Amino acid sequence: MRPSLSLRLVLPLALLLVVNLGACDLGQLTVRTTAKVLVRAQPSLQQESDYQLAHDALPGTLKTIEGFWFVDPENESLISLLTEGYCQYGTAFVEDDWEVAKFAKKLDEIEAHNARATHIFTRCLNYALKQLGDDWQRDLFGTPEAFAKVAKATGGDQRDAMMWSALALGSIINHNLSRVEMLSYLPTVKIILDRVLELDKARLPGRPDYAALPHVAYGMLYSAASAQFGGRADRAKLEFETALKLTSNPEHPDGRLLLARTLMGYRLGLMTNDRKFFHDQLKQVLETPPSVWPEQRLANEVAHRRARRYLSHEKELFQ
């Protein structure tokens, strides 16, 4: 029995529709598969031992991931990778270039790297806000009182996005200290960090570096100014030491996140004019191999790089 004319017409049309739908979704399907691979591959960068290789490779990696995100803009894995990636790129590399220019007193380069750092951390913040939703996007730059309610209502599933938003906003402020309106957002950064630490008291994140980062951020906030202008060396030291404790283990009781010790030695040494503390802490960093924490080898290479730089300028810093 031959199929009816209507059935013979419907079947090819249905097949054509399926093919077209498949073609429309093929890009997203490919990206979603790739995103899973990228998440699994992320530790390879964190374990990199060659600073310059990572410095040169990360921008291209981020732009590739951003291209995938453009195809699938709702992909949470890609947004998470971009959030962390831009914050880490800004901290490890762009700020390092900025700091090199500062010590060399190259004013044009200082200005250029300063502006670039602002742009990079703004990208990190924007991706974090995509994860955190409309209320955060609406109220982050509103009054601290209104925003505090939004932060308080944000649950533990958004803990990491909150952390990156605080680190990004704090870094943006740090690179725009001459803009009074930016300084007004310091209470907002503290609100976010307080909420993250409140969540951490109930349940620490599985990654020790994630547990330590809010304390590093607070250490930097408390050491950002002298005691005369609101800085608190005692509180900053406590926060840095907490970060080190959270990354310690029986084999390495002094902590494995060397960047926390580098920042503590440099910032508190200058803040309190304690040259011995400055020297001893940075010397301890250099006496600890970066491989002490293989999973965070790159961060420890950054710590060594900065410790060497600070010690090379010790005499002029304590004139």
Feature roles, as predicted:
Residues 1-11:
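Bacterial N-terminal signal peptides that target proteins for export
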Residues 10-22:
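Bacterial N-terminal signal peptides
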Residues 21-45:
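Bacterial Sec signal peptide processing site at the extreme N-terminus
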Residues 36-67, 71-72, 85-202, 210-247, ...:
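Short coil/linker segments at helix-helix boundaries
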Residues 307:
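Acidic-aromatic/histidine active-site loop/patch
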Residues 312-319:
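Extracytoplasmic and endomembrane cell-envelope/extracellular-matrix remodeling and assembly machinery
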